[in-house]
Amino acid sequence: MKQKRSKPAGLKKKAPYREEQQFVSSWISSGLLIPLLVILAGIVWYGFFAIHTNDVSGSDDREYASIARNIVNGKGIARNFVYPIDINFFAKFPVPEFMHPPGYPLIIAGFFKLFGVSDRAAVLPSYLSYFILVILFFYFTKTYLKLGTAVLATVILIFSRVILDVSIVALSEAVYTLFFFLFFMVFIKANSLGDIFLAGILLGASHLIRENIYPFFIPLFAFLYFYLDLPRSKKMIFFALGILVPILPNILRSYIDTGSPSFSYGKFVLMAFTEKYPGLSIYRDIQNPSLVDFLREVPGQIFIKYLNNLVNTFKEILSNFNPCLLVFFIVEMFYWKVNPAYKRIKILFLSLFVSQILFICLFTSTHRFFIPFLPMMILFASEGVWRLSNILAAQVKVHWRRGILLLGRFAFLMFLIVPTAHLIVTSKGPPQLGFKIPQTFYLIPREEAKKLIHFLDDELKKDKVVWTDLPEILEWEGNRFCGWLPIRIETIYEIDKKIPVDAILITNFGTAVRPLGEGWKELLRSEQSLPQFRNVKLYKSWPIFAKLLVRDEKNKE
């Protein structure tokens, strides 16, 4: 009887991804990956941290830190800084904080309680968020994708310039990104009413860190309606109740402080950056405009603003996110022959991402609102590279496959990590900042801010209210009550009827970064004073030149 000849083992076809999985497991066990990735994250993060300034140095940073200090000092969730528009709602310091949600200042206040009030304590939540995000991201990715893809994606996340930028500042982006990703994890894995309730709590908590829940209502409730094998009405109710748990205390606070359970600056944000109210001018006037009148009189301005923001949003994303990452992310979004669990992740992400673009463009166009989506974009791009390299490797001879796989993935990795690695190794900042690079959204050096505060303390008592074009400096470094200068000089006298104007501080820095009315610029350049503010003091230092006008004693009541 003729025996059947068996094929030599070497001629057996192996799927490229199987070869790669064997390669990954041959040199390291998955149990060691987490500590190794955390060590890599620590090295990269510290290198990035070491070449940058390490203070609370931006505008919003200082506001968050100042509010947190007020919380620790028992003054409540309040700020020492007022806008001219605030005189329509509040008449004394400190002013209840509704410009920013209270969640992030409360987190910073917790760190102030533990470590004392300092710049470093204010930035600690962002530091920690980076490392926690790396760990959660790896676990989530390896749950739904191959181990090799999870490692590739996590390394890219570790080297992400955008994520690193927000991890060393006291802005809310890093903490919000962590909460949003945690919510996404819980929501996509939910298979019980308890899981849905927990997802609602996490979404509500993220809303207290950044008020960004509104774009997500329609896609999330639509997802609940069509997915998850649970009673529809119960899913909706449990999710809504979960959202309300963290939000209800803030609604109660709003009612106590303002008499309205839903007090908001939302209408001003909507009308700002239009032809009628260019830039932030709407906040720097004492008139309280009607949104209904605005929409009736100039409805086209909102439409033009929306279109401009839509175009600028894509420009912001393209200029701030790695182009190579975006290409593979978009390619992966067109591939839908995937398993049901991964398809659900894609559907949920895309619905949230598109809804965010369409909604946020009503108000602004900054890329900061899309940073929370970046981890998932990295996940999809990494899976796209993994799949395309498998397809490419399948077209070549067997003995070339491993080389093609490794070359493709290594090239993708290099495109994404080399820019950050090069920055860490070679970059130096200006000598005035100790050869360190300014943090993202940097305002002025901390030492210069302190010098300006010393000048003010020498000239004014601590309880005097100063109206200035650099209120964040006075609020955080100076810990004194202050206001933002209105557009017109004469408005100062109207403001004084409700909130004291003890002094006026005009700076060359503030007038350059935030254009004031021509009257203020002329006042800074000339030797003139103002009626009732004839006592003039000058401050000169790099990079600030300032003019202080102190109210005449005889004109004070």
Summary of predicted features, one role per range:
Residues 121-145, 178, 182, 331-334:
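Transmembrane-helix motifs of polytopic, lipid-linked glycan transferases
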Residues 134, 225, 305-343, 350, ...:
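Hydrophobic, aromatic-rich transmembrane alpha-helices
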Residues 33-39, 155, 201, 217-218, ...:
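Signature aromatic-anchored transmembrane alpha helix within multi-pass, membrane-resident enzymes
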Residues 406-470:
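Membrane-embedded, lumen/periplasm-facing catalytic core of multi-pass transferases
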Residues 162-175:
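Short acidic/glycine- and proline-prone juxtamembrane loop motifs at membrane-interface regions
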Residues 142-145, 183-198, 206, 225-226:
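Membrane-interface transmembrane helices that cradle and orient dolichyl/undecaprenyl
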Residues 45, 234-314, 318-328, 415-426:
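Membrane-lumen/periplasm interface segments of specific transmembrane helices
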Residues 1-48, 142, 232-242, 406-411, ...:
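Start-transfer (signal-anchor) and selected internal transmembrane alpha helices
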